[in-house]
């Protein structure tokens, strides 16, 4: 294994302790056995084309010590205690993926460098688009490329630089697909600093306060009501907690979090199968893949029966057909959220300048400018000769430049001993959710009720709130600080006029 070319490309040498040496030997043996060395070398070669472009490795590749030693990822899987099974093992029938995130505003530049270096040896992967069950046309895959040793034959191309193959075709043909994906969060962070992503302190009181208090609006990947609720519920204290919060809100983890043994990551499912069925982790992952992908295939044991027989366990594994993170993916995303929270706490002006430049938020257009206003002395309309009233500004531009909340926004407890609260405010975000289990609709509202102050309200029925600018009503406050409305209606506090339906 010391003769493998891969080892000579290491950018980091791991500590010579049993944990690192044993892990490295294990991974190198699998790589050599399955002829995966060219894929790792190609990814390292591509990263060498972009030394000035920040990147982050999403997905399971962050669980590989070889990837860490090559400088492909900055996640040390031994330090973070992440097994490599989710990424690669002896029983995995296909090649693992290495997905690279780069700032969205620099990805075209990265593609240009790659195509200039490899020329006719590189091409983008395509998607098959079907209509009414029939193939209709090709589209471009979001970021997949292949790089070959020789020129790609013309019969494999739709046009120069684009394959007439989708990701499954690429895999069947024996090519390694590498994904280059866009990240607004990396662009946001890169505009603030060039500090390496994993160079931040793992524990920091000011950073933790931003996240645990729910003050994370503006942090791409960490501002949704669901994330803010998760972060405040667990009380984020460190980078690892930030990773947990980003993962808890994914559908599969959300469904399993109330179980006696919560399952958050796909790695947790592998460990549960291995322990319950008394099999090695690679067999456990094979079982997980067969069930989660829903192909109706069973992994059969020596007795001719399915290895996973427990119906309750099977149901829990099947729940991970919904979207979930592997642990290294959660760490990669959590690290970005943690770094952005660090700068929001310490450099709010730089943070908000970058946020206003790069964020495409789920919140209404007024929310980010309102949050940024206290920290920016040169807000776009501050200092105008004839400054507008907040309501007039909101109506004309869709947002206002004052750090104050729209007049009329309020939240106060009713004096009848019922623990009911009167609320009124502009809608920051709204979402209607349909519960198949209960066959009913819920509406989730986030309202501004004071300067940089928001509440989350659950309405136990569907609302056409997407067209509302503001709402008022009465709600009961739960122990978790969330509100459930018993009465809600549209009100008008200013802002853009509703468009009349034709």
What are these regions, as identified by a protein language model?
Residues 1-502:
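Noncatalytic, beta-rich nucleic-acid-contacting surfaces in large DNA/RNA-processing enzymes
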């Amino acid at each position: 294994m010391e003769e493998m070319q891969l080892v000579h490309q290491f950018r980091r040498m791991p500590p010579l302790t049993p944990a690192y040496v044993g892990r490295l030997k294990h991974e190198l043996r699998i790589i050599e056995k399955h002829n995966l060395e060219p894929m790792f070398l190609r990814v390292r070669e591509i990263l060498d084309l972009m030394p000035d472009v920040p990147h982050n490795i999403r997905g399971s590749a962050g669980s590989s010590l070889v990837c860490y030693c090559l400088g492909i990822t900055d996640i040390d899987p031994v330090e973070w205690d992440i097994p490599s099974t989710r990424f690669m093992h002896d029983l995995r029938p296909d090649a693992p993926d290495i997905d690279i995130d780069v700032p969205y505003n620099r990805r075209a530049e990265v593609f240009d460098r790659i195509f200039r270096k490899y020329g006719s040896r590189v091409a983008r992967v395509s998607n098959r688009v079907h209509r009414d069950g029939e193939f209709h046309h090709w589209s471009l895959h979001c970021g997949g490329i292949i790089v070959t040793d020789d020129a790609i034959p013309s019969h494999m191309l739709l046009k120069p630089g684009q394959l007439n193959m989708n990701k499954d075709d690429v895999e069947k043909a024996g090519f390694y697909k590498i994904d280059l994906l866009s990240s607004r969060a990396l662009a946001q962070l890169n505009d603030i600093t060039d500090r390496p992503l994993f160079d931040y302190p793992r524990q920091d009181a000011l950073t933790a306060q931003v996240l645990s208090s729910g003050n994370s609006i503006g942090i791409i990947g960490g501002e949704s009501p669901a994330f803010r609720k998760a972060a405040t519920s667990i009380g984020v204290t460190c980078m690892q907690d930030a990773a947990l919060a980003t993962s808890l809100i994914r559908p599969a983890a959300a469904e399993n979090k109330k179980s006696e043994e919560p399952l958050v990551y796909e790695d947790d499912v592998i460990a549960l199968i291995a322990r319950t069925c008394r099999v090695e982790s690679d067999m456990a992952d094979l079982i997980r893949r067969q069930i989660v992908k829903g192909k109706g295939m069973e992994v059969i044991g020596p007795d001719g029966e399915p290895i996973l027989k427990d119906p309750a366990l099977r149901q829990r594994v099947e729940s991970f057909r919904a979207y979930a993170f592997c642990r290294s993916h959660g760490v990669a995303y959590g690290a970005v959220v943690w770094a952005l929270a660090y700068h929001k706490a310490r450099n709010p002006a730089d943070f908000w300048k970058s946020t206003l430049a790069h964020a495409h938020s789920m919140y209404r257009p007024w929310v980010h400018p309102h949050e940024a206003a206290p920290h920016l002395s040169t807000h776009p309309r501050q200092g105008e000769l004839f400054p507008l009233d907040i309501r007039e500004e909101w109506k004309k531009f869709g947002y206002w430049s004052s750090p104050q909340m729209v007049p009329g926004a309020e939240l106060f407890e009713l004096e009848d001993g019922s623990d009911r609260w009167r609320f009124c405010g502009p809608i920051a975000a709204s979402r209607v959710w349909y519960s198949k289990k209960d066959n009913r609709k819920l509406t989730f509202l986030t309202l501004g009720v004071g300067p940089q102050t928001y509440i989350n309200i659950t309405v136990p029925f569907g609302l056409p709130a997407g067209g509302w600018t503001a709402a008022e009503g009465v709600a009961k406050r739960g122990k978790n600080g969330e509100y459930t409305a018993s009465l809600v209606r549209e009100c008008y506090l200013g802002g853009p006029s509703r468009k009349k339906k034709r």
